């Protein structure tokens, strides 16, 4: 039984891969035309489809929307019961139908023509009513479905999904859509955390900032070091400009060397240590700390004045790994 299941699964994958391998050679003038229509669309891209095509259409709409093209999915039945009112002349409709003859098209196509809405098609039948009405037709045809009964949409839905991805990625690259653009539409995701957060969003502030003055004794600096547990203390002048840092390592070296605890911390600190700019990207700051093999740093403003402190754990807790 297990061999039969494995063979069936592998056969399905092989058939789907075989059909999908034919897609690249089909991309031509219609693909370019479809991409350009979307790129120059002043409104939204409305994706529509029935059954399995509709399920894939929802994913295509979501991919377009998250990669710089305003898009949403409308079910054909809902479109015919009021949702056509959401579609305007500056919009584009991408209709998915393998047969190209979905009965809803008989009513939808004339309404789109009345509104001068550009129609794009994904279909397996290029000369179907849908194919003839569309300004650009993307060929998702298959020689056979992976279903052993040749009934359930399998290979054809894979082709549809891949063609949708190809179209979305081509449009995305043409728009110059980049990582930061992507992060702005995914603020709760890992990429959003990496690219949208600046140091000032994550840094410790107020009483949580370990700080002493240049004239503070090593003893008091040690107490401040212990109070915050950050592994360092920022050493500042009277204008709160950071002049150095006093770390656990500095304290150990000072004590091993026989230094007095009453000595000003300015003599035991590391002068001109690493500081981070409050407005810098958090991901860049984290990478700097890791490159320098340090775990924490003071945060300063554009004038070098202390505004906060941060350590690697603060980045990790924010999802910046």
Curated annotation (Swiss-Prot):
GO terms for biological process: keto-3-deoxy-D-manno-octulosonic acid biosynthetic process. One of its GO terms (molecular function) is ATP binding. Belongs to the SIS family. GutQ/KpsF subfamily. ATP binds at residues 49-54. The keyword Methyltransferase does not apply. Substrate binds at residues 68-69, 75, 81, 107-116, 141-143, 267. It holds the Pfam family SIS. It comes from the Bacteria. This is Arabinose 5-phosphate isomerase GutQ. Keywords: ATP-binding, CBS domain, Isomerase, Lipopolysaccharide biosynthesis, Metal-binding, Nucleotide-binding, Repeat, Zinc.
């Amino acid at each position: 039984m297990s061999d039969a299941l494995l063979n069936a699964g592998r056969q399905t994958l092989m058939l789907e891969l075989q059909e999908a391998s034919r897609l690249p050679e089909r991309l031509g003038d219609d693909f370019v035309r479809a991409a350009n229509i979307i790129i120059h669309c002043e409104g939204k891209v409305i994706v529509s489809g029935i059954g399995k095509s509709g399920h894939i259409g929802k994913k295509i709409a979501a991919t377009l929307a998250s990669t710089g093209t305003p898009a949403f999915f409308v079910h054909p039945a809902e479109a015919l019961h009021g949702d056509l009112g959401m579609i305007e002349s500056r919009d584009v409709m991408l209709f998915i139908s393998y047969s190209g003859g979905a009965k809803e098209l008989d009513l939808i196509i004339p309404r789109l023509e009345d509104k001068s809405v550009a129609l794009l098609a994904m279909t397996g039948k290029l000369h179907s009513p849908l194919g003839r009405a569309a300004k650009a037709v993307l060929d998702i045809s298959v020689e056979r479905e992976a279903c052993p009964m040749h009934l359930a949409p399998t290979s054809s839905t894979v082709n549809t999904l891949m063609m949708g991805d190809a179209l979305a990625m081509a449009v995305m690259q043409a728009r110059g859509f980049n990582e930061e653009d992507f992060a702005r539409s995914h603020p709760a995701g890992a990429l959003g955390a990496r690219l949208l957060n600046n140091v000032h969003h994550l840094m410790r502030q107020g009483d949580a900032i370990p700080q002493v003055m240049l004239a503070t004794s090593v003893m008091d600096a040690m107490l401040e070091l212990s109070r915050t547990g950050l592994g360092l203390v920022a050493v500042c002048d009277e204008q709160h400009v950071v002049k150095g840092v006093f770390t656990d390592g500095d304290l150990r070296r000072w004590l091993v060397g026989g230094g007095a605890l009453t000595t000003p911390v300015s003599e035991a600190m590391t002068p001109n240590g690493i500081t981070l700019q409050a407005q810098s990207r958090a991901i860049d700051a984290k990478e700097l700390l890791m490159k320098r093999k340090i775990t924490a740093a003071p945060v300063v403003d554009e004038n070098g004045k202390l505004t906060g402190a941060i350590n690697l754990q603060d980045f990790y807790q924010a999802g910046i790994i």
